[in-house]
Amino acid sequence: MGKLDNKVALITGSDSGIGQATAIEFAKEGAKVVITYYSDEEGAQETLKKVEAAGSNGLVLQVDVTEEKEVERMFDKAIEKFERVDILMNNAAVNGQGIKVADMSTEVWDTAMKTNVYGYFFCTRRFINQVRKQGGKAKIINVSSVHEEIPAPGTAEYCATKGAVRNFTRVLALELAEEGINVNNIAPGMILTPMNEEAVEDKEVRKDQVQHIPMKRAGKPEEIGKLAVFLASSDSDYVTGSTYPMDGGLMQSMGQGA
């Protein structure tokens, strides 16, 4: 018997990396998974294959989370297929562009805000209203970053959005506590994902970055997935408003413990 039997989870950005790994871990625990992607349909279909190989069912949907109507359509399709959604993982995001504020275009700033903040808002609002309609307990898991606390020059737009996600999580936790909706936040550090490898292409630079991590290694996407299982299951029913750094001790080493 799995920890997520009879649950339906919707994970944005589940075509690769953390989202894909979490979809697989959820499926292993019995959850049906709504797999979403923006442009990588092949990756999303690969996630579906792995979800089915784990013995569960999935649904692949393309969505632009910055568009409110597309988010509404995504939820409508999910409900049409599975009749309910019990778990929302806000994971779809864009990375920092390595541009200092003085040189940053409004477009770069807006792209980060629309995806990393508005996307979370649109999905969360729709999810809350669906949970109220269907009844029962529910879980919201937001994915931020260690850069919610650790500043990185050249990524102001990214750091600002991740700080927003953390405080969004805390406010939601207080607003929804009496409704049986738990809201928590995962703050990944260096995780071996395609997105991070693309952001830092130089292997020597990545090797140097690892040396600043107390555990002296990067994390694996499935490690995030296993934490997400805890936050999505009844094991975490008395946990809300918390941030969980998954960073090998990086935030603690910089005096930035959550």
Placement of each model-derived feature along the sequence:
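Conserved glycine-rich cofactor-binding loop
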Residues: V8, D15-G17
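Short C-terminal tail/terminal secondary-structure segment
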Residues: G98, V229, T240-A258
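Substrate-binding pocket helix/loop in short-chain dehydrogenase/reductase
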Residues: I99-V101, S105-M113, Q209
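Active-site loop immediately N-terminal to the catalytic Tyr-X3-Lys motif
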Residues: A102, I150-A156, E178, K216, ...
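Active-site helix of classical SDR
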Residues: T124, T161, T169
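Alpha-helical segment proximal to the catalytic Tyr-Lys
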Residues: N129, L174-E178, D237
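Residue(s) in the substrate-gating loop at a strand-loop-helix junction
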Residues: S145
